[in-house]
């Protein structure tokens, strides 16, 4: 993790006040994931990636997921370009804040991760499974008619009733992520036992 980035975040937070009490309403912020990273490291005494690998990746058999600082074959990373008319590859796209999404993974690993939310496994308790799909977006300030909104937060999810699945009563949990050049979309249908992941070097995670 980029220590300078986390230090700057903590420095900014020392001069700010909460806009509302914790849990009063639901918002998305990468800073929250970075803070979660720091909490995990402080409580566990481990680097976040070591903790994630030990507690999640290895038990789940996910062997193709890496942090930027890991030793892996970077030539496997998809090359990116400024435009279709310029064949010069850009430098490796890297996010140094691991908690905010600075991971590399194959689509297979990402889909398998989504599969952890489909059915019973040893990594998620029933309580954790239930809480991750709760409609947290409905807490506090949120339009009453929001069933088809692109954002409808769950615990860590961008949307927990994605259109058009929600219209048919099918639970659909969605998470997208973007760096400057890489984009990822994960859709999980927990009750149907299905997960799909799409990775790209163009477009956005939302389309």
Where do the language-model regions lie?
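Short, surface-exposed loop or secondary-structure junction motifs
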Residues: 1-180, 184-185
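Short, well-ordered beta-strand elements
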Residues: 175, 183-189, 193-202
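Short, gly/Ser/Thr-rich active-site loops of penicillin-recognizing serine hydrolases
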Residues: 169-170, 198-207
